[in-house]
Amino acid sequence: MAAPYRQPEEAVDDSEFIDDHHDHLRDTVHHRLRANSAIMQFQKILVANRGEIPIRIFRTAHELSLQTVAIFSHEDRLSMHRQKADEAYMIGHRGQYTPVGAYLAADEIVKIALEHGVHLIHPGYGFLSENADFARKVEKAGMVFVGPTPDTIDSLGDKVSARQLAIRCNVPVVPGTEGPVERYEEVKAFTDTYGFPIIIKAAFGGGGRGMRVVRNQADLRDSFERATSEARSAFGNGTVFVERFLDKPKHIEVQLLGDNHGNVVHLFERDCSVQRRHQKVVEVAPAKDLPTDVRDRILSDAVKLAKSVNYRNAGTAEFLVDQQNRHYFIEINPRIQVEHTITEEITGIDIVAAQIQIAAGATLEQLGLTQDRISTRGFAIQCRITTEDPSKGFSPDTGKIEVYRSAGGNGVRLDGGNGFAGAIITPHYDSMLVKCTCRGSTYEIARRKVVRALVEFRIRGVKTNIPFLTSLLSHPTFVDGNCWTTFIDDTPELFALVGSQNRAQKLLAYLGDVAVNGSSIKGQMGEPKFKGEIIKPKLLDAQGKPLDVSQPCTKGWKQIIDQEGPVAFAKAVRANKGCLIMDTTWRDAHQSLLATRVRTIDLLNIAHETSHALSNAYSLECWGGATFDVAMRFLYEDPWDRLRKMRKAVPNIPFQMLLRGANGVAYSSLPDNAIYHFCKNAKKCGVDIFRVFDALNDIDQLEVGIKAVHAAEGVVEATVCYSGDMLNPKKKYNLEYYLALVDKIVALKPHVLGIKDMAGVLKPQAARLLVGSIRERYPDLPIHVHTHDSAGTGVASMIACAQAGADAVDAATDSMSGMTSQPSIGAILASLEGTEHDPGLNSAHVRALDSYWAQLRLLYSPFEANLTGPDPEVYEHEIPGGQLTNLIFQASQLGLGQQWAETKKAYEVANDLLGDIVKVTPTSKVVGDLAQFIVSNKLSAQDVVDRAAELDFPGSVLEFLEGLMGQPFGGFPEPLRSRALRNRRKLDKRPGLYLEPLDLAAIKNQIREQFGSATEYDVASYAMYPKVFEDYKKFVQKYGDLSVLPTRYFLAKPEIGEEFHVELEKGKVLILKLLAIGPLSEQTGQREVFYEVNGEVRQVSIDDKKASIDNTARPKADVGDSSQVGAPMSGVVVEIRVHDGLEVKKGDPLAVLSAMKMEMVISAPHSGKVSGLLVKEGDSVDGQDLVCKITKA
């Protein structure tokens, strides 16, 4: 029993929700409209359809003073067309009909109409619009069917009958079967006579369903079965007919109108050639560049055919025009068409109004629609915006529309259906959201309007075809107006899509996740201590006036590198009278104190001031080392993007990076070509000075990096890693060792010599001796010294280096200095100021910069290691500064936090066991991993040696012993090495000699296939960290570029009602406000998070990771696993063609999906054996749900 739609909790008629004022207003409007619509004698119209076409009809009906009635299925109860009518009634009761079946329930629809006093029924298009039995039932019930007579529908709705009619009228047709065919053998007989290609068409209905082009015998049977199945599913009749397929024809259709007195007029033609799967995608009216004589013949034939059957109401005669401009009749569609809008725009005629008034008895002459009065003006183009994913074969997308903003403006018409924020797009119906029609005085003006309108749309939450439509309308062939019916299939470059960035919604997804689940940044402990605005410092000149820092400083040591080259730079540094400073705040300082977590946005925020305050600095250490992988791994930033932005903001100070020799910035050796490629791109992107080191001081490993930097034309700072205590005669690494190493390095022609004291164990007297000895031996070689202040002697050591002849020493801004970081820049400047070693920096400016970092450190307080002071014990355990804080964190994560003192002692033991090696990344990690292994397993040094053959050592330890990190000075420890390696190989040369060169071109293609685009910088990142890079790219695909998000909101959620700003790019700012966090849904385990974005409320659904729910979702296919076959779209499985264990070949059908009245075959991506079949017939699946696996033979 049909009944008005009711809210579940209240059995109240909809009209009770409309107050008296609105009733009065509606009646007044109806009265005034009726006064201008004398032709209309009826009062109420029902539209037997859904989506946009009922809304279109309701609007005209209201203009004609008709009351309107909508019908809807249970699944459509929230659809917009229900709300646009005066009354709305559900078809049957819940579960009585399928979603599509409800709109095919002719008896039920007629019953609803009778019960509610309907006088006219408009069928729209699709569903029952071409069903003669439905038209008869309407008329038999005493109502008026807005369309042709039932007999006309019978004669023309059947394409075979229409074809026979054309032949009788001497209108040309394409060769085809004389009547409908029901058996495969009949189709086979036709192809035996006429050959291929052919087209199989459903005899009833349209929209491309039940239609297949077949080009060879192998596909014939399957295509016939699919076409008949689709036709039966969509139209209730599986009858098809067959025609010879024309290659590259145009599809031209003529809009017709006929009255009840035998009068027929045409409203000119439309070019509907741009199609996909025989469904129209873009339509143009009138056809551009159609020869006049051809147009006239087509129009004449269309009218002739309509008159021959006394055609009544609106209809469309369709023709194909081949490349010789010969036209062939296809069919007459006895209904209104989706694309009727463009005809309305060029003729000024409301076709729906004409339909209704003709049905009410009006003649064409009464409506002013005689042929001599009908003309066209300008051009109109229509696009159908759908929820389809062009990158996945236009598979329909489903889900919730999170954002919906329409286009508009001069010449833009929108006919919408369920396009609105909050709409749920289901797999049950057609995927169209809105029709966008644009008109202009010329074809080109109309085309440009459509492109502009498409760009103006903002639709989020579901994929749309807008990027494809934009590509299509911008293609030269479309611009020229020369498209044909298979143009989309024949033009693969249309799919080189530039998708919408969807930045705001992706950002909301991240912010929503932080709001629900808190920060997921690894290593973060709690929320920041400081959440206020960071005050930027002012730099004052000698007169106390603020310097203009709106632009960066452009004078510094980098200009010598750029203008004169690395050699001239090295000479200038050596000739400089003072001792220059390298500021490590932008890299090693925050690596040592804040787990390398400082983000790009916070560096850029102080960049201009830095370029002025440190304009005479030797360099800024700001890239490479751990910052490279941490940027991707934990901060979700592109390290190359960081480098580019920093370089632009600081153009005057040389940038220095840390290069791990033959490792690049990775933790193990890579093929040589990967190192050369990396250095070339790093130099191109902004690095000036490459501090090249090897973790074992292996000169062969070091040589790879040095030569790579030379090839990139960068400044080579070849580095000696300092370890131990050279003043202690019992220690392994003495002055002779270091001088011999320097000799080997100098032979490789570096521009600068670096000394890298990773643990801060270079005592002042040792510094004076080492630097002084090198200076004496190499008086023209610039020397740069790096240290950590772990023991508290860093300032003294750096001053000793300066006095012994070093040209540059390292320091960090005061508030980021000391302990495991570098010594204080303020202390060094104060100590050297006014001496012959004066660094030439303005102490007041340096202090001003520090005021910024003092605030910023509080913002990053969740990453503090909570060290309280210097640790002279470093002279014993020799743990590098950068590793010390990480080791503390790792120990706590492994449950060893209470045994920190024991861990430090174990570090000494591990170092001795490994042969007292040089300890810097990655060898320091080897020692650290072995130390934690010893503590967690409660092992002694002797236990490790004795049980080495049975212990499962950490991977890094085995890699070191194997020789993958190079050759240590003094050799590997025996018998530990042999016992631990067991049957693993032992390398006696540098690892790179055993590695095949990377196929960089193949990597680039792989990245492009996986992520849509690829740069050389992407290739370099992948070469260093394949898995980290892929995870980062996937994260960005989900959440977008988070580098623009202020750190306060990156690490913690805002307060409810707090407003904050995010600058996406110059001049584009999002104004955001967290409004509410919804309750937990027990069904989904999600919470709705509500944000206000530029004054507009948006919501995102977030998984609550703390919730415990029964997850009934199907597993998803892993796109990176070629054996896994995923559903290409959401839908219902209508047929299974395989079973577990079956051998299949590439392209064999596995299953058939039906969605949005379309069937799609899931084919085998490669040959192999089927396993793990997870679906059965009748199952509903979502896009990318795992269907089965196919294991390659």
UniProtKB/Swiss-Prot annotation:
Residues 1116-1191 form the Biotinyl-binding domain. Pyruvate carboxylase catalyzes a 2-step reaction, involving the ATP-dependent carboxylation of the covalently attached biotin in the first step and the transfer of the carboxyl group to pyruvate in the second. One of its GO terms (molecular function) is ATP binding. ATP binds at K159, E243, H278. Residues 163-360 form the ATP-grasp domain. Coiled coil: none annotated. Substrate binds at R587, D588, A589, H590, Q591, R660, T921. This is Pyruvate carboxylase. The lineage of its organism: Eukaryota, Fungi, Dikarya, Ascomycota, Pezizomycotina. The modification N6-carboxylysine is found at K756. It comes from Aspergillus terreus. It catalyses: hydrogencarbonate + pyruvate + ATP = oxaloacetate + ADP + phosphate + H(+). Residues 41-493 form the Biotin carboxylation domain. Its cofactor is biotin; Zn(2+). Residues 579-847 form the Pyruvate carboxyltransferase domain. GO terms for cellular component: cytoplasm. The keyword S-adenosyl-L-methionine does not apply. One of its GO terms (biological process) is gluconeogenesis.
